[in-house]
Amino acid sequence: MKLLQNNIFSPISLATHQSLQIIDVFDVPWTKTIELESHSSLTYLVVGSDADIHIELFTKWSHCSCTIFWLFISDAKHPVTGSLKVSLKHSQTSANIELISFLHDWAKLGIDGSIYIDPYLDQVHGRLLEQNIVLGKNISLRTLPKLTVSSHNVTAAHGANIDTLDQQKLFYMMSRGLTKQQSQTLLVTWYIDYVLGHFTDISDVNKTQIHTILAP
């Protein structure tokens, strides 16, 4: 399976002891399911614009883990909606989720991220963070991170942040000779590079493709 895929809708199923890194790029509506077997590990990135995206992931046995990132861009012509549901059904499993969006003028974004931890589980970790980077005006944003925990011996956290290129940051960057557009580009680039740093085998060509899709 290729590291980077364009508009591939087939399910992802990791076998026992399999470790996999996948980047999905989508610009069309789609739905995808992911299954994790025992002792498997998935690092997964979704890059999207102008899309209606829905993912459901669930564990099929214990001792498996996933790290999932979403990178979205939205403006007046590219509304984005989506949902990510992660179901941890077995002990000694973990999910680390970060949903990051770049919102330009007249952006429309509706994202529901959720982690469900079943009853009677032990040593389970769940983390869900939604980060919305505001780069424009007149933005419509609906975000609802949800964490449902039905076990006691677990660690779990969730939250949502809204970040802007505030006036202090902007003044500092412009005092160094950068325009507002260049300052926004630096901010977006930092987030993208942070995510891509989790993918050890990504090529420079793939990096350039992702930066181009998400460029301000």
What are these regions (language model features)?
Residues M1-F171, S175-L178, D193-Y194, T200-T208, ...:
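Conserved beta-strand/loop scaffold segments within soluble protein domains that form the structured core
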Residues T185-D193:
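Small/polar glycine-rich anion-binding or flexible loop at a beta-alpha turn
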Residues L178-Q184:
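Short, well-structured beta-strand/strand-turn elements
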